[in-house]
From Swiss-Prot:
Keywords: Acyltransferase, Fatty acid metabolism, Lipid metabolism, Membrane, Mitochondrion, Mitochondrion inner membrane, Transferase, Transit peptide, Transport
GO cellular component entries: mitochondrial inner membrane
Coiled coil segments of this chain: none
InterPro entries for this protein: Carn_acyl_trans, Carn_acyl_trans_N, CAT-like_dom_sf, Cho/carn_acyl_trans, Cho/carn_acyl_trans_2
Catalysed reactions, semicolon-separated: (R)-carnitine + hexadecanoyl-CoA = O-hexadecanoyl-(R)-carnitine + CoA; octanoyl-CoA + (R)-carnitine = O-octanoyl-(R)-carnitine + CoA; decanoyl-CoA + (R)-carnitine = O-decanoyl-(R)-carnitine + CoA; dodecanoyl-CoA + (R)-carnitine = O-dodecanoyl-R-carnitine + CoA
The name this protein goes by in its record: Carnitine O-palmitoyltransferase 2, mitochondrial
Positions of CoA binding: 453-465
Residue sites binding (R)-carnitine per the record: 487, 489, 500
Top-level taxonomic group: Eukaryota
Transit peptide boundaries: 1-26
Assigned protein family: Belongs to the carnitine/choline acetyltransferase family.
Length: 658
């Protein structure tokens, strides 16, 4: 599964540009209290002229697929897989590919992967908790007083509404990846490009090495939810909703944050309403409704219908149409592991996992976004976090000295009541039991390597992302004695309706290098080991560039399989091969994220015997946040990652590995 958005090299399109925007000056003058910025270039200015996601040549896809299979298979297995792949290329695969190309030509408004990818997410019947929803936590406000729960919750809510208004008014700066910022990330460029018609604007940006990114996912950020339905869920958005949903102790509250004229409600009133909720002594409900959103999706679909039939239509409509969900937890965070557990799943009592996103805030003001993954890949979420962090810390709506407005919050704030019959109560108790069992099986460990980071690696002409990925390969080999299927998500937002492509970090180069470092370090000089590091870095850079340009193999093979299935054809043999199942059983699922607004990100493993590896390469350190279930030892794995990085940085000092 594509999890968090990758951002570690110059060709990790989405997050790089987003993280640049954190420190970027506003585009035209100072924004007023209703907006985070007022871009002179309309938000969707480039959308119409974005290039289309290319469908790779079938022979390139098969070649890349076999290259990725090589380190995972012995000679006999590889020969069989190679034969099946070539048969596919010259037989049914060729016909399917030609049909896919024709379909794509008839659907120029979108990409060939968009529909199948939505289906993949929305048809999945597993719980979205752990299996799909990731979290990204905010960096603390640099001023401790502003991290008080009421202060930060108020400021983030106001900044979130400023972002909503900015986006809907078309004042949000278009998302652009600047290869030459000195030339294109300038007021002069913006003044010129705004007059280029939308049908040509992308080409104008391209001329100065600037790459506008797809922003089609952004509209689903607010007022949205995933609605459980039999066999395939639906995404639902109602932009008319003006209220915020707040959860505290499993109770649901709503109040307006946008007034009837479309203005943001005064910050002092929002503060008063949140204070009212924080002071409410209503106990946690005996049967907290939020657990139902963690259910298997067909089960939840039946139960939701039962809720509607029980007279809860109005209350559920309020939940679904809220601008977003704010979860106020009544305990502090102890450390990064407890932070990760709480933001990824929590106790389940105080969550509604179906909303497009929730801001979760603990008693000490630690905040994170937990988001539903089907509607987007983190591109919009990361931009939202960057802008909200910047706005709430640089232009906070209230200060610790601010007084709440003298308003009657008991009238403005509505606590939602749900009618539950005995069968619904039993279903909630059952959902809670399943939820507790699944989250109790999850372990998380974090690691910080302090001997170097991005800056040192760049002086050595090594890709920081390649080195991180290599450390995971070495760690797995050290712990389990073999190379395993590895997935790294890479955004294809450089294309219209692009989603993600997979980088396959396990290669013949990483296998050779890992074996040399882990099994036979004394047989190789530091110079020989350094040469292997360079080979790994070069090849990883090539894979990353190909993926970002839509030239991986995973999405193409996925789309061809989807097409065969939709035509009712028998499954081609390439997909029945045990090696195909193995490479898609992603034991190492990895995703990287680096931004000044982000403290930590994480997700659960995508297979029962896997690791979920969130990582970040910073200027002078490397960190990772890893999850696993009980079949794997996650603490030992992060120790092995640390050992691997230690060995790599030792070699970079031209010293032998001890």
């Amino acid at each position: 599964m594509a999890r968090l958005l990758t951002s570690s090299s110059a060709l990790r399109w989405g997050a790089v540009s987003s993280s640049q925007s954190v420190g970027r000056a506003y585009s035209s003058g100072s924004p007023d209290t209703e907006y985070v910025q007022r871009s002179i270039v309309p938000t969707m200015h480039f959308q119409k002229s974005l290039p289309r996601l290319p469908i790779p040549k079938l022979e390139d896809t098969i070649k890349r697929y076999l290259n990725a299979q090589r380190p995972l298979l012995d000679d006999v297995q590889f020969k069989k897989t190679e034969q099946l792949a070539l048969n596919f290329q010259n037989g049914v695969g060729k016909q399917l590919h030609e049909e896919l190309v024709q379909q794509d030509k008839q659907n120029k408004h979108t990409s060939y992967i968009s529909g199948p990818w939505f289906d993949m997410y929305l048809c999945a019947r597993e719980s979205i908790v752990l299996n799909f929803n990731p979290f990204i936590s905010f960096t603390p406000d640099p001023r401790p007083d502003y991290n008080r729960q009421l202060i930060r919750a108020t400021n983030m809510t106001v900044s979130a509404m400023r972002f909503l208004k900015t986006m809907r008014a078309g004042y949000l700066e278009p998302e652009i990846f600047h290869l030459n910022p000195a030339k294109s990330d300038t007021l002069t460029f913006r003044k010129l490009i705004r007059f280029v018609p939308s049908s040509l604007s992308w080409y104008g940006a391209y001329m100065v090495n600037a790459y506008p990114l797809d922003m089609s996912q952004y509209f689903r950020l607010f007022n949205g939810t995933r609605i459980p339905k039999p066999n395939r869920d639906e995404l639902w958005t109602d932009e008319k909703g003006r209220h915020l949903l707040v959860l505290r102790k499993g109770n649901f509250y709503v109040f307006d944050v946008i007034d009837k004229d479309g203005n943001i409600v005064k910050a002092s009133e929002i503060q008063a309403h949140l204070q009212h909720i924080l002071s409410d002594t209503t106990p946690a409900p005996e049967f907290p409704l939020g657990y139902l959103t963690s259910e298997e999706r067909n089960t939840w679909a039946v139960l939701r219908q039962k809720l509607l039939n029980n007279g809860n239509q109005e209350a559920l409509a309020k939940v679904d149409s809220a601008v977003f969900c704010l979860c106020l937890d009544d305990f502090p965070v102890e450390d990064r592991v407890s932070l990760s557990h709480n933001m990824l799943h929590g106790s389940g009592l105080n969550r509604w996992f179906d909303k497009s996103f929730s801001i979760i805030m603990t008693e000490d003001g630690t905040a994170a976004v937990n988001f539903e993954h089907s509607w987007g890949d983190g591109v919009a979420v990361l931009r939202f976090q960057n802008e909200v962090f910047k706005d709430s810390t640089q232009r906070p709506a209230i200060s610790p000295e601010s007084c709440s407005a003298p308003v009657d919050s008991s009238k403005a704030v509505q606590r939602l009541h749900f009618n539950l019959d005995d069968s619904l109560k039993a279903a909630i108790a059952n959902a809670k039991e399943k939820f507790d069992t699944s989250v109790n099986a999850l372990s998380i460990a974090t690691m910080e390597f302090k001997k170097g980071g991005k800056e040192l690696l760049k002086t050595q002409k090594l890709s920081p992302d390649a080195v991180s990925q290599l450390s995971f390969q070495m760690a797995f080999l050290r712990q389990y004695g073999k190379t395993t299927a590895t997935y790294e998500s890479c955004s294809t937002a450089a294309f219209k309706h692009g989603r993600t492509e997979t980088v396959r970090p396990a290669s013949i180069y990483t296998k050779k290098c890992s074996e040399a470092f882990v099994m036979h370090p004394s047989k190789h000089s530091p110079a020989e080991l350094r040469s292997m590091l360079q080979d790994c870095s070069k090849y990883h850079g090539q894979l990353t560039k190909e993926a970002a340009m839509g030239q991986g193999f995973d999405r193409h093979l996925f789309a061809l399989r989807y097409l065969a299935s939709s035509k009712g054809l028998s499954l081609p043999e390439i997909y029945q091969d045990a090696s195909y199942a193995q490479i898609n059983h992603n034991v190492l699922s990895t995703s990287t994220l680096t931004s000044p607004a982000v403290q930590l990100g994480g997700f659960a493993p995508v297979v029962p015997d896997g690791f979920g590896v969130g990582y970040g390469v910073h200027d002078d350190w490397i960190g990772c946040n890893v999850s696993s279930y009980q079949t794997r030892d996650v603490r030992q794995f992060v120790e092995c990652v640390h050992q691997s990085l230690d060995d790599i940085f030792t070699v970079l000092q031209d010293k032998p590995i001890k």
